[in-house]
Amino acid sequence: MSNSLSSQIFTRKMLICAFTGFNSGLPLFVLSQMLPVWLTDKHLSIELIGAVTGVMLPYGLKFLWAPLLDRYFPSFLGRRRSWMLLSQVALLILLYIISLFDPLTQLGTVANIALLIAFFSATQDIVLDAYRREILSDHELGLGNTIHINAYRIAGLIPGGLSLYLAAIYPWETVFLWTALCMLAGIFMTLFLAKEPKIDMQQTNQPFYQAFWIPLQEFFQRKGVIQAIGFLLFLFLYKFGDSFATTLQTKFIYDMGFSKEDIAIVVKSTALWSSILSGLAGGMIMLKLGINRALWLFGLVQMVTIGGFIWLAAFGHFDVITSAELWKLGVVIAAEYIGVGLGTAAFVAFMARESNPLYTATQLALFTSLSALPSKVLGILSGYVVGAVGYYQYFWFCLFLAIPGMLCLFWVAPLKQENNKTSSV
């Protein structure tokens, strides 16, 4: 058993999954964790900071250009690796350039650059998701996506932890440069680790409207209209509550009275071990229980962890930060990393299982877009909601938003049914 598990984990494919997770997570966490603290340091209001989160909308709309990445691609590295490299180089450059402008006087420029970061990050996600689905067998999806998700979460330790610690010592421009250079890990993977998968390229010769329509048609024919609609509704709702809760997570912690150094130290000390714990547990649980049962179990865990933010918000602003306050923050952050990490791992494995390998880019982009769209659209209003009712009521609202997604599991992932086969054309 031990040797069998080790032989599944320590492979080139799983190493690539770790790299895809890290490079997918880094730019997103810059926008969701590092950017709000930078804007707060520049004395922008909570309403403006919440509105700026609207730049993350490309994550919810990436299905619109996903067919282009299947159909058109530079020839120098192949269909997947060419787009990987182009998006990663663009992100490396943009993550530094954004720091050259003052948000207080040039907020429009900063927002536009952040929008470009989100666009290239979403583009990278399209290709990385498709690539990962193409290199992993159905049996490897649970473990591979667990490794991807936890590397994705660990990537958040840089903009959400180490970079904030450095920001207390160095100018923000230096911090953004250091953070941007971390994208070199993805460039290394693309050039030296990843190999172009061998996939039937017949669909790339079709007219563009067919490249967009046929993957959707295949999905609805395979699932049936009613089941397909239920599946898409589930994608829309399952991560709604916890995604909305974490939209202003770093801003919330900052407003509670914790310094950048406090956030960095606590995140560094708790998020790493909790990510590793959830990664090991999540992969083994999915191998044992299957994806459907994992969705139920992990969904309940991620919903309960929203309660941690409610508990912390109930204390109000801390005038003095002692070890007791740091301990409280550590408990909440650890629970959040475990809960969201587990829930996301099962969710991503579920989406990958339901996609057809011939149309991975378009179908996975549609699936992940639907899961991201609610929080990205309503995230624009998050600052105004907090400004109107406060953090305590806001997190209660997020908890109730998580319930409809759990109810959808009765429809799309019954406990007594486990489909481990991915349909193909």
Curated annotation (Swiss-Prot):
Membrane topology of this protein: Multi-pass membrane protein
Compartments in which it is found: Cell inner membrane
Keywords: Cell inner membrane, Cell membrane, Membrane, Transmembrane, Transmembrane helix, Transport
MF (Gene Ontology): transmembrane transporter activity
Predominant place of localization: membrane
Pfam families: MFS_1
Resulting phenotype, A271S: In strain: RM 7004
Annotated phenotype, changing S32L: In strain: RM 7004
InterPro entries the UniProt entry points to: AmpG_permease/AT-1, MFS, MFS_trans_sf
Entry's Gene Ontology cellular component terms: plasma membrane
Resulting phenotype, E418K: In strain: RM 7004
Spans traversing the lipid bilayer: 15-35, 48-68, 84-104, 107-127, 149-169, 174-194, 225-245, 271-291, 295-315, 331-351, 370-390, 395-415
Variant or mutagenesis effect after changing L5F: In strain: RM 7004
PANTHER family: MAJOR FACILITATOR SUPERFAMILY DOMAIN-CONTAINING PROTEIN 3, SOLUTE CARRIER FAMILY 33 ACETYL-COA TRANSPORTER -RELATED
Family: To E.coli AmpG and yeast YBR220c.
Annotated protein name in UniProt: Uncharacterized protein HI_0350
Organism the protein comes from: Haemophilus influenzae (strain ATCC 51907 / DSM 11121 / KW20 / Rd)
Lineage: Bacteria, Pseudomonadati, Pseudomonadota, Gammaproteobacteria, Pasteurellales
